[in-house]
Amino acid sequence: EVTVTLNGHNYSATTDAAGNWTLTVPVSDLAALGQANYTVSASATSAAGNTASSQANLLVDSGLPGVTINTVAGDDIINAAEAGAGQTISGQVTGAAAGDTVTVTLGGNTYTTTVQSNLSWSVTVPTADLQALGNGDLTITASVTNANGNTGSGSRDITIDANLPGLRVDTVAGDDIVNSIEHGQALVITGGSSGLNAGAVLTVTINSVAYSTTVQADGSWSVGIPAANVSAWPAGPLTVEVAGQSSAGNPVSVSHPFTVDLTAVAISINTVASDDVINAAEKGTDLTLSGSTSGIESGQTVTVTFGGKTYTASVAANGSWSVNVPAADLATLPDGAANVQASVSSASGNSASATHAYSVDASAPTLTINTIASDDILNAAEAGSPLTISGTSTAETGQTVTVTLNGATYSGNVQADGSWSVSVPPSALGALTTSNYTVSATVNDKAGNPGSASHNLAVDTTAPVLTINTVA
């Protein structure tokens, strides 16, 4: 057994045949850790009594970095001259370091930069990108991930008021990602315009297929993409291209990138309680449910349904996941067969689920010992022949019954009819003196639940004395 100590709490784990071990620290214990450096110590003692130990340092950094975005164009309103000159978007970060990457998104376009030594950052949005956005309200978002994997973000609302004719494409499929479910459905692409006449014809091109639509009185437009065409889109980056003419007859166009994510995702559930059977002892301690995923990003949420309750876990960097089921929840589980379900979705919305069967067997098997030697008394004649000790049990066929008499043990197996028996040889019976003995028997069912019984046996191997008085 391995004992692990973290923040004053001890946890136990058992090594497998290869010498590996693992354990789960409850969420409640992790939540109690402050942001600091901790020492994790582990020790183990072999069967021979030899002890080994090891330590590792653990940094807890659960604080999210912050990102701020400075005022854009002096007043968060980009006019015609400012749009024509391009704009620099800048800001500051906290909880991050120089060299960390800042990702900025504006109107479907993404720009990246690195944090400077004074924790500032900046990106340049070119004139062409600004003019393609057209007039209207927009939101700038910026995010940064620090060295410990914590991600923070910030946003800022701006307005483009440049009196520019232009077109805009709204977010595609809600997040600019078409997942495997959406890939099989019809899709509506929408957008807006300024400086175009109502009724102006627009050509929308996706994956080399052109669709025609018209501008509405409020400047909006939309086009429906049939499911057959959507399902023909290949995985990877695609672009919505929209082209038309302004009210002055000048050509206007816009491009909007999106992604088709058809990554196959999967989730699995490992064996429950090492053998898919929860016995009485296991029912009295916390249980770890675990499994693995593929095609799922680190940090995505796994939802587990077990015993009528729902638990959540996060996907680790290696695709694994685990949840802790408290003993209090296990205590309410009835005996019988059941299933555990787990489901997860990727960041793009592709989902997977799995079901795993297990059973609960927390009932101890019954065990009885029949009358021994027909009257529970072993006489001298019976002690000279093998003695059969027998009984019944509700343990499964083939389970081993261990019988102890006078310090010696004998083994038998449960038969199909529930009976069992062992034979005690005369050599062992001969060692019994005239006295009272206790015969004990034990058995474990396949789930590991123990059953036991005992029976009294009297040994009387002393021959009676017979005398004949003097005759006449």
Regions found by a protein language model. Name each.
Residues 1, 89-93, 189-193, 289-293, ...:
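Aromatic/hydrophobic beta-strand junction motif of beta-rich domains
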Residues 12-16, 112-116, 212-216, 312-316, ...:
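Short, acidic Ser/Thr/Gly-rich low-complexity loop/linker segments typical of extracellular
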Residues 19-23, 119-123, 219-223, 319-323, ...:
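Short strand-edge motifs at loop-to-beta-strand transitions and within beta-strands
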Residues 27-37, 127-137, 227-237, 327-337, ...:
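Surface-exposed, short loops/turns at beta-strand junctions within beta-sandwich domains
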Residues 54-70, 154-170, 254-270, 354-370, ...:
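Flexible, low-complexity linkers/stalks enriched in Thr/Pro that connect modular domains
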Residues 75-85, 175-185, 275-285, 375-385, ...:
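Short, solvent-exposed loop/linker segments at the N-terminal edge
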